[in-house]
Amino acid sequence: MKREVEILAPAGSWECLEAAVCAGADAIYIGGSRFGARAHADNLNEERMLEAIDYVHLHGRKLYMTVNTLLKEQELGELVDYLRPYYEQGLDAVIVQDIGAMRLIREAFPDLPLHVSTQATVTQTLSAQLFQRMGAERIVPARELSLEEIKNMKNATGLEIECFVHGALCYCYSGQCLMSSMIGGRSGNRGECAQPCRLPYRVENRKSADLMSLKDLCTIDMIPELVEAGIDSFKIEGRMKQPDYVYTVTQMYRKYIDIYLQKGKKGFHVTKEDKEKLENCYRRRGYCDGYYRKQNGKEMLSFEASRKRDGTEERKKWITYYRKKIDGTLNLAEGTVSELTVWLHDRPEMTVTVTGDMVQTAKKSTPCGRTDRKADTENRKYPVCI
């Protein structure tokens, strides 16, 4: 097949950015210091973001910046100045939720591509056409659409279509959740979702369970269907994930999209070993195929506790086999750089030293912790392994 399909990988840090590039992503989406829907990610400051734009361009890739929160009145006046240095550096696109922000960006930067965020809740063709008239070049439809609905939107508008293919799913409609704001005072539409849907809840006369927590999305087996539906960009969720997750998932989708584009359906088959690699990389509560084939299916829900995996079985076996006792010293003296040195208990000549920030005395007025909550440490162990 001659059609090109973009792999769009997440980056919540510089390390994740490098991992995405190395794994074969065509483009990376990342948040800056403001206006992004992942306020608690290790977002880049202005200097590092400018470096990131140059870095991906040197590797022949693209960088999309998230401006996907709802802006307040006073923030609109700051948005143009915030984006200007990135625009001048060659930023490839901005992903936007707020309609007012879209209009402002289009007026200030007429040739900067606008991508409509999934947070804008584009659920049908008329909405897509509205954004098209506003100058959008790409739509990220609401996650709740079926493949047939996505195909119709593509055919009716001719816009680029970007869809999530892997990662976490929200219980509520994209961009319409107020639960975090109501329960915890942290709005998902301001980049501070506390993920209350991941918590256990108790229904009357029943045991507590994770009643609103969806399984993670995985569409590696559906690549032929997604391509044929007209999806232009395969988006991987995970700006809060670690570099090894970004690398592994991006690499897998790169591999199998290329296989399908080169060999078609007859040559397309995802091996059991590669599926296991995806599962071992990160799996919250099992996988599902989202809303693409069946809407509102109860099989999307998991009532079990989270089963996050943070490494391969081989890595776990290696850690178990090589677990050794270590000794160490931590030097903290005011006005000096903090320094930690560790060594093997039975081989003191094998040492590692790392340094950190300058040590400062804490002010009395600075709260250093909370006394109204107790950490559950009785059943937890935190071994240090070399």
Task: Identify the function of each model-found stretch.
Residues 1-22, 27-30, 34, 59-69, ...:
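Surface-exposed amphipathic alpha-helical tracts and adjacent flexible/coil segments at the periphery
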Residues 105:
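RNase H-like DDE/DDD metal-dependent nuclease/strand-transfer catalytic core used by mobile genetic elements
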Residues 125-126:
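Conserved nucleotide-cofactor-binding alpha/beta core module
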Residues 120:
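Conserved catalytic-core segments of large NTP-driven translation/proteostasis enzymes
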Residues 38-57, 191:
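Glycine-rich, positively charged N-terminal anion/phosphate-binding segment
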Residues 100-101:
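Alpha-helix capping/helix-boundary segments
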